Each structure stands twice: as C-alpha cells, then as structure tokens.
C-alpha cells in the first residue's frame, strides 16, 4: 500500500487500524511531516519494521518526509548507500522472501522541485533500475496523464528517464482530483497485480494505492503457541507433587545428576500442567466492533461515490461518514486509556506497558555489515557475526607474569575470611518468593513463575542442590550457558562494535548467584574492604553520591582560586575483559578462599554463549574472560577486580563500576606533574591487570580562570581537551554552572511530553499527572542535588516544562499555573529541589548514604538556641558556583527545620514530616 499522508502523526491510530484489519504487509508513505522531535516509537506498529527519512531542509516549512513500514518476516534492510545520490526525500530498503530480493523505494518530489533536485532524481532512478525495484511516491507532475501518454516540456525529462531505464508506470487513475500525482514504477510488471486506486486516506486529499506483490513468501497462517504460565492451575500441580516422592526422586551425590533429576521433574510438571495459548490476534487493543462498523460504513460510502460517477452528493455523504469514523476511532482509544488508568492500582503493568510501547520501539539489529563490508540479510548470519565480535574482545591472559595484588583483607583468612557457605531453606524460600515472575526464562527453559509458585515445594531440593554445589565447587553446565541479546548503544547500526552483549542465564543459577553475592557483599562491608571511591553496586552509594563527592572537591578548590583539572577515563569493554587468574588472585586478597573461591572458579570456567536475534541463534562460542553482563554475581566481582585501581594515586578519584574520573588542583607545574605521575601509575595498572583504556574517549577538562591548561599523556596518547563531558548522565562543563545540563534535561523532558501529547488520546488529569510523574519529572530531577541550577533563566526554563505538562490537561487549561498545581496536587520544581536537598542531608546525617559527612559539613559551633541538635555551620563562599553548591546552599534550610522533622526514624517518615511542616508553614503565611 502507498499513501500520501499529509502528516502521519495525526493519522497514526487510523493507519494502525487500517493495516491490521486489511493485513497489509508493506506501507509506503510520503509527506510524513515528521521531524527529529517525534520518536520512532510513536510511529511504531507492532510486528512491523519502521524506516523513515525526514525532510532535512530546515528553511522549508513543515512537510515532506518519507517512510516505509515492512512486516518483520520480510527482513527489511535499509539501503543507505542509495542516499549518496543526494535526492533528499527518498528512502529505500531491500526485502527478501525465500532468496528473492526486491528493492522498495518511496520518494517525495515537491511541487517547486529545482532542476538540480530533478537531476538527482533522474540519477537515482538510473541507479536503482539495475535491480528488481518497486518505486512509489508523489512525483508532483500534475499535467502528466499516463493513461493517455501525454507529456509536456516540464514532465518530458522525467518520462524519458523512466522509459530509458525500462521502468513501467502502473497507476492509470488520478490520485488527487484529476491529477496523476502519485505513481508506482516497477522494473517487472509481472511481480505486481491487482493494483487499484482507493479512497483518500482519512483527511488526506490524496487517494491511497493498493497492489499485491507476487513473491515466494509462505502465506499460510502460522499459528504461534506459547506456554502460558499465568493461566496454569498451580493448586492442581501442588496436589500432584504430593503423589511424587521428591525426597527419593530428587536425590544424588553428584551436582549434575541432582540437577538433571530436578529439571526432569520440572519439565514433566511444565508439560503436564502449563497450558498453551495462541498468539493474540493482529488487532489493536482499543478497537471495538463499533469502530470497525463505522470504518466499513465509511468505505462503503466511498465506493458508492465512485460508482455514481463521482456525484458530489455521494461525496458529501462520504465526508460525513469519514468524520464519524475518525471521531469513533479516537473515542474508543480514549475510553481504552481511561480504563487502563482507572485500573492502575490493581493492574499497573497493563497501563505502563501500553505507555512504554509509545515511548520506544524495540530496536531491530542492523542491517549489519561483515568484515568484508557485505550487508547481511538474515538473522542467522547477523547473530553469527555479532557472536564472533563479542567473542573477539575476550582477553588472552598473560600467564607468564601475574603481578602481586594489594592485600586488602587484614584479618585471619581461616577464621575470618569467607571460605565456606552453608545455605538454609529459609534463605532459598525467600529468594524464590522475591523472583520477578515477569522476567524471561533462561536457556534451560525453567520459568520464574513456575519457581515462584512452587517455592514451598522447591526450597528443600534446591537447598540440597545449592549446598552440594558450593561444597563440591561444581556448577551445573546449564548455569554456565548464556543466550546473548545484543543491545544497540549509539553510532552506526551496521557496526557490530556498537552493540553491547547482555546474557540471559538460568533463573535457578541466578538464585544461587544471589545468595553467594549477598555473602560476599556482607563480608566486604563488615571488613570495609571496598574503597570509598567506588560508588557502583555498593549499598548506600549511587550516581548521586558519586557526583556530590566529586563536585564538592571541584567547587571547593575553585572557590579558593585554585584551577583544577578533571580527567575522565574510559575502559574498553571492561566487563568482558577481566582475566580470570588475575581475578582469582584479587579475590584471595579480599579474604575470599576455600570452597567459595573454588565455586567461583568453576562458575567462570567452561562458560559458553550464543547470540540470538528473532529466535535465530548463532553457534556456541567459548567465553574465556570477563564477568557475564546480565549476571547477578558479575558486578560484585568486577568492583573487587578494580578496587585497588586508585590505591597508589594522590589525586581525587571517583568510580562508578568502570566509570572512573580523577581531579587535582593545579597551582603550579609541580601539581601538574603529580597528576601526570598518577596517569603513569594508571597506565601501568592497566597493563599489569590487562584492562585497556579506550584512549580516544579519555579526556581532560580544565577549570578555573588562571588554568595553564597543561597537557597530559595516558600511555603514548595525549589526552584530548574538552569543554564539557557527560558524567553518569550529567553534563559537567568547564564553567561548572550546569546550564548545558539544564538544557539537556529540558530537551529530553519536552521530547517525552511531546510523545505523550501525540500518542495519548485521553488528556484527563488522572492520566497526564501519572505519566508526568513517571516519565517526565524524573528527567528533570535525576541527581539534581549535584547540579541544581542557580541562574534565573535555567530555573525558569525548567519550571516551564511543568507549565506545559499541566496545560495539557483538558480540565486545567483555563487556570493559571498556581491553580493548576493545586488541582493536580503538584509542587513547583524549585520547591521539590529544596525538599530533595533536605532529604539528602537527612540520609547523610543518618548514614543511609555512605558518604564522608565531615567532608561536606561541620556542626554549628553554638547549638544552644532553639531547634534541633544537628545544626550545621555556615561557611563563607566567594564564587556563585560554590555558594549554590549542595553543601553550602542547604545549611540555612536545614537549620530552620524543627526537631520533630529531623528526628524521624526513616526516610519516608522524614518526607511525611517535612511535607506537613511546609504545608503548615504555607497556611500560616
């Protein structure tokens, strides 16, 4: 199907309804009127690949743009090399069916097309005519009448180009009034049949074009069935288990044997009691019978208009039916959204699943290119290339030299170290109860829902299995196998290096990983073994504590007129490159030995993985280094491995897992030399422990007015100077004012608001406020205590986002901002930032956030006045960036709080007391 949409955004619901009911495989669209603010996910139709190319000429008014929807089983591969011809509004993809390949294209030639633009179009046609091609589009030659083969001077070059390239034009009816604007060209007319010009697409003034593409595609209905774990009769299953003597059936002295017997029982229960359900019908969830009836009435009215010889009277009737159909369609969608919102307390998953489908479409992988530059056109080949790449980054460990690791554990290894582990049934039962039943099953096919429902029955045999596994230091092979899902990061989708592997492993194996991890973490915390510079995967530390701790040092040094240099470091494929023998040595230096260490050694040994794309899998590859991304235990092992990274450094260092940064005040060349020496030590550490830096991404930011901007080397590479850098998602710039971060947060928040406005039909307070709180406001408040704006323009611009959000609510549009906030139960963003400041101080004082409190605050010298006992001393600051940083700005507000608020025994209690205090204070005013 091809259509000139004249804006797809306001017709997307109707398009989805039409293609599902008519079972359309390919949809070519011109005049999409899309722009960069509109996300792919907003245009997503489940089961289809969506490709787009928006108008690039910013000087032109809105309009233009082309797109193609292709059903996923047709394996659409975008042909980006054809854009080199430089005809701007064109998009191409290849589709394949059983070995046959067809090139599909959509173009839009504007009415005022220049001679240069037309020449580019002719060059494009000349290039694509070498292939089996179908080209759809609005060519905007109104005087051209293909059914009469009449041409005039303006369209003559185009007709000559089509004829010279032996393309065939198939449309023999006008598509807009009496004009032949929309055409379908093909290289072989035998592959196209049943072409007809239909009714206008909704409110567009162009008629749609339908045709059938002949291919070797298997068009038999494939009924896909899945096991439905949420419809099983678990009571009946439990009764059946009572008839089985699991104490006898699930018994053995070997780990693999015991695991095999347990899985056989679980597979038997699965096959016997878990029902199969067919795939949901190809129908939008909000479509009702009434919607379908109105749409058919509209189509019937159009057919009457055509059969009447285009009598105006019948056209007027068609327009009435069209308006009713559009109105009913939108009403049905609004009612569906209201039902989801009203049931949110009992079924929040359905509501947010629906919303998330509008936020992001599932990223398709590729099309990838192999090492020879060949475009891969099937999922199996793509999976193989990705798996080869993921395996290529593994470290070949240098066993000829293993350096001595710093001894972090100072206790008695035998009596105080973590060398053995005994697991009880209560621990296993609790882990089973905590399983997220909505997660996927692992490669072994055992679903978390099944495990959760049978927690009472399974905790005894699993406890036996886990203890045997730990004591023997043996892990079942099933737990060491991973199905890897490639996640796109950024850059070109054609390059395998722009994908990150995430491993899907056995759920049962993850339960034991979790128990082992808990014991390791408890051991590390008890002996205070993890350095305070590490904020990732550690209790009481986070992105926020990392940023606060680091920027406290930066702003303090700048305030006393000391220039400071910040260096951001980037490890290359850090999690995948951890060499095992060196890791085991690090574990020993942290007091982990005996059967626990033996178990970890076995858990990491003989691992293998395969990559899966659309259920097509690569061959298995051995995993020879790294901690599995997606595992439970992996992150803890990683932070142990890099724990001593900064042990010998003088500069200030902050880490979040592998994200590492350092800073040093630079008052002289001697200070710069200290920082250089730290970089030399880091370079040596990376060589000793075989953790490579990605030198292209390691940068230095110079701060301070009198900064001499010294140069620094890491290895043999001079560090690139940067004015700003993204630090854990927050933009840090050389001015330290965070205006760029404000702009970035506003941009992302407005983008999400735009998605909500375009995608959510119902604009009730209930829905908009929920979506604003869940999806928009967090973008404005992520780690905001570390970058809270103090420039008036930034404060105003941030608040404007909430202005826009509350204006979207239909019932609030006539109210001023203050009244809208009251109606919606919202505070200003500025007030929320103050509240967040107070919460963070409370968490620091109470030790909930494990950050050096004395580095931020000093107790007030005279604390005998009214108020609480936790008052803070106020210090003087010279620069605005220091006056307005967290440790300085919070003091007055904190000291004014009454003891009744400060003495709360939990964070939630503090929040409630603070809110009551502020509300009462506002009322008194």
Report the location of each language-model feature:
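Short phosphate/oxyanion-binding micro-motifs
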Residues: 1-130, 143-166, 177, 241, ...
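Conserved pre-catalytic core of RNA-dependent polymerases
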Residues: 87, 383, 390, 418-628
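Arg/Lys-enriched, amphipathic patches
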Residues: 102-105, 132-136, 140-150, 212-377, ...
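Active-site palm subdomain of RNA-directed nucleic acid polymerases
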Residues: 123-136, 516-534, 559, 635-663
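Catalytic palm subdomain of template-directed nucleic-acid polymerases
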Residues: 141-155, 573-589, 660-684
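Short, conserved micro-motifs composed of acidic
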Residues: 172-191, 195-197, 615, 677, ...
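Surface-exposed loop/turn segments and immediately adjacent short secondary-structure elements
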Residues: 208, 212, 216-218, 242, ...
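Non-catalytic, peripheral interaction segments enriched in hydrophobic/basic residues
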Residues: 278, 287, 337-341, 520, ...
């Amino acid at each position: 199907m091809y259509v000139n949409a004249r804006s797809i955004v306001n017709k997307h619901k109707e398009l989805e309804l039409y293609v599902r009911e008519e079972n359309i495989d390919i949809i070519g669209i011109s005049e999409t009127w899309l722009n960069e603010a509109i996300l792919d996910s907003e245009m997503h139709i489940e089961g289809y690949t969506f490709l787009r190319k928006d108008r690039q000429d910013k000087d032109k008014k809105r309009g233009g743009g082309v797109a193609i929807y292709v059903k996923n089983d047709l394996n659409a591969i975008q042909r980006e090399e054809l854009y080199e011809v430089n005809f701007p509004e064109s998009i191409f993809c290849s589709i394949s069916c059983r070995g046959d390949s067809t090139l599909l294209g959509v173009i839009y030639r504007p009415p005022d097309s220049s001679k240069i633009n037309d020449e580019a179009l002719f060059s494009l046609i000349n290039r694509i005519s070498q292939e089996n091609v179908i080209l759809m589009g609005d060519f905007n030659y109104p005087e051209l009448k293909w059914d009469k083969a009449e041409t005039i001077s303006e369209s003559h070059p185009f007709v000559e180009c089509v004829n010279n390239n032996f393309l065939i034009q198939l449309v023999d009816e006008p598509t807009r009034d009496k004009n032949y604007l929309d055409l379908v060209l093909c290289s072989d007319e035998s592959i196209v049949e049943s072409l007809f010009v239909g009714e206008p697409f909704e409110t567009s003034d162009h008629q749609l074009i339908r045709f059938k593409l002949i291919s070797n595609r298997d068009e038999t209905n494939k009924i896909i069935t899945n096991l439905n774990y949420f419809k099983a009769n678990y009571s009946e299953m439990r009764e059946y288990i009572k008839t089985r003597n699991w104490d006898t059936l699930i018994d053995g002295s070997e780990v693999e044997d015991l695991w095999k017997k347990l899985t056989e029982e679980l597979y038997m229960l699965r096959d016997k009691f878990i029902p199969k359900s067919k795939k949901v019908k190809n129908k939008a969830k909000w479509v009702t019978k009434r919607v379908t009836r109105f749409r058919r009435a509209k189509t019937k009215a159009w057919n009457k208009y055509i059969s009447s010889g285009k009598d105006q009277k019948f056209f007027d009737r068609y327009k009435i039916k069209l308006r009713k159909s559009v109105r009913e369609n939108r009403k049905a969608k609004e009612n569906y959204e209201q039902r989801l919102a009203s049931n949110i307390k009992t079924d929040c998953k359905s509501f947010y699943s629906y919303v998330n489908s509008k936020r992001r479409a599932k990223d398709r992988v590729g099309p990838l290119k192999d090492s020879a530059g060949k475009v891969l056109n099937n999922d199996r080949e793509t999976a193989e290339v990705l798996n080869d790449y993921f395996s290529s980054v593994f470290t070949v460990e240098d066993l000829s030299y293993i350096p001595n690791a710093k001894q972090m554990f100072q206790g008695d290894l035998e009596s105080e170290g973590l060398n053995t582990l005994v697991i009880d049934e209560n621990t296993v039962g609790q882990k089973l109860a905590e399983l997220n039943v909505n997660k996927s099953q692992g490669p072994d096919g055992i679903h978390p829902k099944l495990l959760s429902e049978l927690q009472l029955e399974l905790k005894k045999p699993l406890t036996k299995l886990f203890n045997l596994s730990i004591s023997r230091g043996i892990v079942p092979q099933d737990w060491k196998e991973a199905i890897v899902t490639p996640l796109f990061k950024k850059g070109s989708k054609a390059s395998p290096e722009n994908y990150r592997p995430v491993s899907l492993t056995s759920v049962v194996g993850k339960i034991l990983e979790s128990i082992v991890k808990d014991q390791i973490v408890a051991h590390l915390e008890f002996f205070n073994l993890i350095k305070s510079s590490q904020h990732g995967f550690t209790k009481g530390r986070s992105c926020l504590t990392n940023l606060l701790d680091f920027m406290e040092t930066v702003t303090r040094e700048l305030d006393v007129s000391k220039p400071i240099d910040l260096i951001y470091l980037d490890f290359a494929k850090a999690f995948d490159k951890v060499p095992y023998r060196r890791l085991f040595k690090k574990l020993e230096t942290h007091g982990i030995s005996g059967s626990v260490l033996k178990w970890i050694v076995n858990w990491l040994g003989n691992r293998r993985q395969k990559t899966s794309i659309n259920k097509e899998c690569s061959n298995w590859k051995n995993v020879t280094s790294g901690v599995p991304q997606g595992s439970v235990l992996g992150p803890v092992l990683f932070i142990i491995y890099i724990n001593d990274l900064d042990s010998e450094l003088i500069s200030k260092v902050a880490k979040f897992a592998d994200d590492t940064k350092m800073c040093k005040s630079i008052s002289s060349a001697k200070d710069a030399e200290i920082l250089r020496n730290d970089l030399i030590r880091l370079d040596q550490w990376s060589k000793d422990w075989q953790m490579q830096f990605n030198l292209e991404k390691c940068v230095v930011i110079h701060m301070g007015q009198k900064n001499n901007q010294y140069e620094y080397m890491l290895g043999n590479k001079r560090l690139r100077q940067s004015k700003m850098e993204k630090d854990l998602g927050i933009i840090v710039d050389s001015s330290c004012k965070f205006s760029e971060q404000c702009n970035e947060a506003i941009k992302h928040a407005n983008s999400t608001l735009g998605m909500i406005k375009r995608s959510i039909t119902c604009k009730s307070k209930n829905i908009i406020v929920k979506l604003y709180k869940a999806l928009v406001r967090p973008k404005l408040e992520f780690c905001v205590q570390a970058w809270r704006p103090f420039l008036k323009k930034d404060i105003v611009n941030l608040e404007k986002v909430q202005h826009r959000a509350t204006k979207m609510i239909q019932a609030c549009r006539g109210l001023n901002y203050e009244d809208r906030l009251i109606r919606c139960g919202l505070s200003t963003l500025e007030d929320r930032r103050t509240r967040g400041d107070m919460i963070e101080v409370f968490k620091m004082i109470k030790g909930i956030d494990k950050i050096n409190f004395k580095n931020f605050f000093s107790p007030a010298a005279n604390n005998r006045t009214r108020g609480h006992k936790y008052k803070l001393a106020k210090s003087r600051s010279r620069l605005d960036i220091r006056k307005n940083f967290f440790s300085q700005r919070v003091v007055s507000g904190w000291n004014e709080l009454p003891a009744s608020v400060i003495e709360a025994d939990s964070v939630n209690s503090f929040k409630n007391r603070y809110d009551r205090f502020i509300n009462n204070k506002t009322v008194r005013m």
